[in-house]
Amino acid sequence: GVDVPVVKQGSGPPVLVLHGGDGPLDRLPFAESLSGSFELMHPTHPGFGGTSIPEHFDNLQDLIFLYLDLIDSLDLKGPILMGFSMGGWLAAELAVISAGRFSKLVLVDSVGIKPGGPFDRDVADVFALPAEELLNAAWHDRSQAPDFAKMTDDELQTVAANRVAHGLYTWEPYMHNPKLRYRLHRIDIPTLLVWGENDGI
């Protein structure tokens, strides 16, 4: 098996929160606010937050089956499934395969579905953008963004490792599954799509 660290926060109906390429979200203001009414569970994808990537992992499908096993091991009954960016893609894939496990689905600034043609750039190349441009694209409120200049060497190593893991899971095909859009009809639970108009990614 693969060990997955899970941070629990708050109390109430369970919410499984799947993070994106920046890593776990439990310290952001939205999480503190929601934890007053819900029990948030923040798993860390392998390769993020200083964790290791199993040798046999090479794409997002490995995360899909890892999380199906995790949900079983946590004995979650009808949790709300919430995903951000890459985590939204992962959440959509989980809901397509097994919507009956979840009570509701929330996708925030999700990738995973490519609306344009094969040569349309629907998602910014987050691996090629300079750090400042990436922060400006990803954060409407830069005061909430990470400040790389103030990070320790260990923290910067974690950021670099997060980017490696992010690339492993999302690079080929870039930030989407071309078949996912044709499977979305299988999701038959209440679903909320959240998108920030200033999202530059």
Can you describe what each PLM-predicted range is?
Residues 89-97, 102-135:
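Flexible "cap/lid" loop of the alpha/beta hydrolase fold
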Residues 24, 197-201:
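Acidic catalytic loop of the alpha/beta-hydrolase fold
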Residues 2-52:
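Conserved HGGG/HGGXW glycine-rich cap/lid loop of the alpha/beta-hydrolase fold
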Residues 27-28, 51-57, 116-119:
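Conserved catalytic-core motifs of eukaryotic protein kinase domains, centered on the activation segment
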Residues 41-82:
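Active-site loop/oxyanion-hole signature of alpha/beta-hydrolase fold enzymes
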Residues 153-182:
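Hydrophobic, aromatic-rich cap/lid helix
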Residues 187, 193-195:
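Short beta-strand/loop motif that positions the catalytic acidic residue
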